[in-house]
Regions:
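Glycine-rich phosphate-binding loops of nucleotide-dependent enzymes
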Residues: 1-261
């Protein structure tokens, strides 16, 4: 049984049909990509999956439980965490503090314990700091722990967003254009990181990505949206050769390259 299933998801904004009967499944141990031309509905699907939007139709099932109607923080606590297309860090907090903020969904200390600075609070604080430092190192930010997030390079900020998302200890990690604005070396480094995460830190990754060399080089499964509808699904090579995908991308003057190109 799939770890996550989206069944017939539809979403309208006034007269605009943003998503139309979209279904997909995400299995344990998989890196899957969600691709499509600009305006295809990819981020809308992420926003619907994470509770920012409620679908007009359809079901979202995670571990045999419906996520429809849950608030974003409850979905995070359930085990699904994400990054955003537009970076959303606390610029005047340090790298370490930003990662610690991401742990709020897993905190088990009561408000009185926090206010009274109890032993349990201090124990969780120490554990949290240790975990945050581990994630900082994992994402290549060692030595930048006390740097303000706003002082990081664009690529470093992307990595920090990933570290913060991992701090919630998700089973599924959703990444919205994680390599946007990166050069080929930076993108390759992130691809290596994503492969390391599977099985050790998360069970599955679903990413939105416009860098087709990343998509074709890392994905076990690729789902393609166009005008809010899913037009193709398969392994990278199947999708690259699908006439519907070729037509959708050629309509924008772009092409889906081979990962070796």
């Amino acid at each position: 049984m799939a770890l996550l299933e989206l069944r017939g998801i539809s979403k309208r904004f006034g007269g605009l049909q943003a998503l139309a009967n979209v279904s997909l499944a995400l299995d344990d141990g998989i890196i899957a990509s969600l691709i499509g031309p600009n305006g295809a509905g990819k981020t809308t699907l992420f926003n619907t999956l994470t509770g920012l939007y409620r679908p007009d139709e359809g079901e979202i099932i995670f571990r045999e439980r419906s996520l429809i109607g849950l608030k974003p923080e409850n979905i995070t606590a359930a085990g699904i965490s994400r990054t955003f297309q537009n970076i959303r860090l606390f610029s005047y907090m340090t790298v370490l503090e930003n990662v610690l903020v991401g742990m709020h969904a897993r905190l088990q200390t009561s408000l009185p314990a926090i206010l009274l600075r109890s032993k349990r609070f201090h124990a969780q604080e120490d554990q949290g700091r240790h975990r945050a430092l581990e994630l900082v190192e994992l994402t290549g930010l060692r030595g930048r722990e006390e740097t303000w997030a706003g002082q990081l390079s664009y690529g470093e900020q992307r990595r920090l967003e990933i570290a913060r998302a991992l701090a919630a200890e998700p089973e599924i990690l959703l990444l919205d254009e994680p390599t946007a604005g990166m050069n080929s070396q930076e993108a390759q480094s992130l691809m290596t990181l994503f492969k390391e995460l599977i099985g050790s830190y998360v069970k599955a990754i679903l990413l939105i990505e416009h860098n087709m060399r990343v998509v074709m080089g890392i994905s076990h499964r690729v789902h393609v949206l166009d005008y809010g509808e899913k037009i193709a699904e398969g392994d990278p090579e199947e999708v690259r050769r699908d006439p519907r995908v070729i037509e959708a991308y050629l309509g924008q003057g772009t092409w889906v390259p081979d990962a070796r190109d």
